[in-house]
């Protein structure tokens, strides 16, 4: 239990991730112990952590989705990342809805943030040519953005226009925003 609490004190983790960490620890420290006993002890610790609220896959997924969205990750990239943590599709969908709740077009906002971070499209400092445009298009597409969003970001002429588009995409029309 100490190892689990120490790990969860340092890192946010899903149930599956905690199982993996405890399994590796047990394999390293308890090599002579029966695997069935180790698995049982690991399950007991994980169940106790769940009961005490130390791990919550829904909250973990929501926090990860919000953080990834702020970094400019596409919905596809966020889904793949959360699947690596062995989270179910329902939890992932709910996390994405929570992360995108206050934004009209969160995918567009994420694409603009990605372009800004990678200096693509209007954020590019050099002289844009056709080859550069193809490279930028490929970079956005590999990041999981649709071709329509890629074209919109790259076809915008100025940074000011793109920032206005980002503000429009972020406004949900709800009072208080």
Protein language model regions, located:
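An alpha-helical, amphipathic repeat domain used for nucleic-acid recognition
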Residues: 1-177
């Amino acid at each position: 239990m100490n190892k689990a609490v120490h790990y969860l004190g340092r890192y946010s983790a899903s149930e599956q991730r905690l199982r993996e960490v405890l399994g590796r620890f047990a394999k390293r420290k308890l090599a002579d112990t029966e695997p069935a006993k180790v698995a049982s002890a690991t399950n007991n610790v994980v169940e106790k952590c769940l009961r005490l609220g130390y791990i919550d896959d829904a909250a973990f997924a929501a926090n990860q989705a919000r953080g990834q969205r702020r970094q400019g990750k596409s919905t596809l990239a966020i889904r793949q990342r959360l699947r690596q943590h062995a989270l179910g599709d329902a939890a992932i969908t709910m996390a994405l809805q929570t992360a995108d709740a206050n934004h009209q077009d969160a995918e567009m906002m994420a694409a603009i943030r990605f372009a800004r971070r990678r200096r693509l499209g209007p954020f590019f400092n050099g002289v844009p040519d056709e080859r550069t445009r193809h490279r930028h298009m490929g970079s956005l597409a590999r990041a999981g953005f649709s071709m329509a969003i890629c074209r919109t970001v790259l076809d915008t002429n100025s940074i000011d226009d793109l920032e206005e588009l980002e503000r429009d995409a972020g406004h949900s029309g709800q009072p208080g925003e």
